[in-house]
């Protein structure tokens, strides 16, 4: 708790209370309380936090390192690191120099007396100094560190072995710390980086020397540390030429590792970074080095892989991961070297066959990269053919560079690997596995199915024939030489191909006929066969007899607890295919009759997800009936018991029947399930998915309507169902809405029920929108607004209201929308009010055209340095807009929808009041969720109002924003700059930058004039930033004048203002 990276020195601390003896005594009380009494722990922690914030800690913390108690040493080291990171600039130049010299001296002379974690902390502290002070205080940190152990860097044969590890530790941490340092500006980072890079070659030379040493226990430690250091400098993005071409380092590493398996793990990390850094950038310019390194890998690592498997050493996974990453990041480079790529894929597949299924998962991204290359080849071939037709003299394209035909054999072998690894265990039942292992196995089968499908999309008939041949062979050999597990794995993978198989489907009836004759009592095999039937519904929809036979076979399975779940899912999958559903609809009466035992009991349906699936499947089949009356009658027959239950629930609540708690919970659960069922019913008639802005996938992808025509065959024709039989759905929804209105009007209602109703209304709104029917939306809006005001405020209610806005006429004033926003805004102010959170008896105040909010004179003891003298602003000082981040987020998202689609329905005064609320409370917004919601809202409306200034309907809103800025603009900009300069946590500065960008782009003159006035004041936003630095910041902002203002401009301003960093 007290080792906090965010503490800053305070000047009002009594320094006299801190002595080294007192700090040690307090630390002993913390770590070793007498009689295990921890009652004083909070006071001890607070005292230690004060100590770390004090200036005395600069002199006392180093003395704690001399303690013989390791916990006290660690506290001292942590304090030193954090002081340097956050308060280094508070020291004078002489004090900095003395502190650095003493720290380096301690490391050189006392290293053997400290634990490893303490040394690491102190090395981190030194690296932070290097980031802060390179060039101005510490001229050559890399050179100085090298000379700790190699005093004459031109004679590497002479070195101090006692300090080699310290040198390597510092060399490892320096580039890592500089890369990740969030306490220096980008300009400073670049300066330090240039200085570090001057000595790259010497660093690699020393690492090469260490990797060449004769191996013993001590040098083995040096080598492991050297490999870690090597990895760090690779990630520092120094020139690859220095360690691939100009140095023998990589070769020396291979030599050392080949002689000692103990170095394999560390070298694997080096190689993995080398092949993956920035998407494989290192080897793009050094293909000869790629071939050399990969050849060496193929020489030694497959044997290490086998050895690790034999010893059950998990390092075999890391070896396979390296091979996978090589293919992922360098697939094109492999393609250019056929001999090397053949050896690579042979080794990869052999390792996969010997490894476990978790290792084989790593083949999946390899296949994805090959598939992408194949797609590129296909596209290039088409383009080349077109170009050749137009102009035969055109230079040939490089389609051969993407031709993967030479790898077809390996793709087929990968499919076989996935098939073998997808088999159920041969020596035990899957139920005997630990739950975690079983989950991993089934997750792998999903990955295997996806990967085989990718290969099928490349080779199509070859892969299908390969799987069918395997299946026929296994069936013929069963049970003599083949087991059901092999048959089941093949069937499972065949089912995964269903969405891509559109031709040559004659094998499907034959397949089911043969499978039906197998004398096997294996539940997994039966399950996979049923899944196959469900997935291949798009291929069997032309055969009425065959389809009805498959569905009829499901009904006995409904009575088997082990098969019921998969049978019901397959029945639902088949029913979702409109052609299959249409065929089955001819027998709907018989199907309902067969399901009668399930449908006869509401509780039985709602308590069992499988029964739920069966009922949903019947509703899908009903949706394809030819007449509206049939759809309405059969749907009502199935749904009426549940609608009646919901209505009776409301009646029972009104009568306040005395019920046992258990009975109440049962009824509540059944009520929730009934609402969910009705939502599922609506979903049948709407396959559009709603995004976070309330728009549909169709709306977002108007230009992609012709893509993926052969995919998702089970749902291709759902829209036809919607269009043909939508009137009965409207009738049922119309009957449900008043019932839900009664439920929402109850004085008490569980939040889960309100959320379920909100989800139903989301789906109902989308159905209305798809068919230009918006008559229900005003009533839905009214109900949800009432629910938000009457019951516990829920973010999901606001989310549904947001979607309702999208589906209403655009830019047309609607009274119910204005009333809704007015009431909800008042409720939000009540939620944010501290007083209302303590006492909910406060009356709801409604915002109208003359918004009237009672002035609260209580002072919140606000610590803001900016004082608000305006009474209008003072009344908002006691609000806590971060108290419920999710609700605040959805509220501002809802207003964003108003701005985007119906700004004319925003009551006058709401936006200006919200701006005032945020203005006053900016410095109290500490969480990212609230910050993103508030500042994105402000940035959008500032930008949008200016963009829409020519629109007459936007004139009132634009006038309101301009009027507010004319009154509070200077204070607003001052508060924004104060916040960016350290008034709010650094984690949310990125969102403040959005507001700055909107002001700079939409109101550049207003912003510049106010910013100049604020920044010209000495000490604003802090005394750490100079006048020249503030001028540079403002000039950088005005230079861009766009909504895409670089974040680093604002973050650098924040770091400098906080005194954490300087550009010098």
Curated annotation (Swiss-Prot):
Glycoprotein keyword on record: no
One MF annotation (Gene Ontology) recorded for this entry: small GTPase binding
Importin N-terminal domain segment(s): 40-109
One GO location term (cellular component): cytoplasm
Keywords: Cytoplasm, Nucleus, Protein transport, Repeat, Transport
Principal location: cytoplasm
Record region (Disordered): 695-722, 839-860
InterPro entries associated with the record: ARM-like, ARM-type_fold, Exportin-1/Importin-b-like, Importin-beta_N, Importin_beta-like_NTR, Importin_rep_3
Example GO BP: protein import into nucleus
Assembly behavior: Forms a complex with an importin alpha subunit.
Physiological role: Required for nuclear protein import and mediates docking of import substrate to distinct nucleoporins.
PANTHER family in the cross-refs: IMPORTIN-13 HOMOLOG A, TRANSPORTIN 3 AND IMPORTIN 13
Name under which the protein is recorded: Importin-13 homolog A
Organism: Dictyostelium discoideum
Gene field: ipo13A
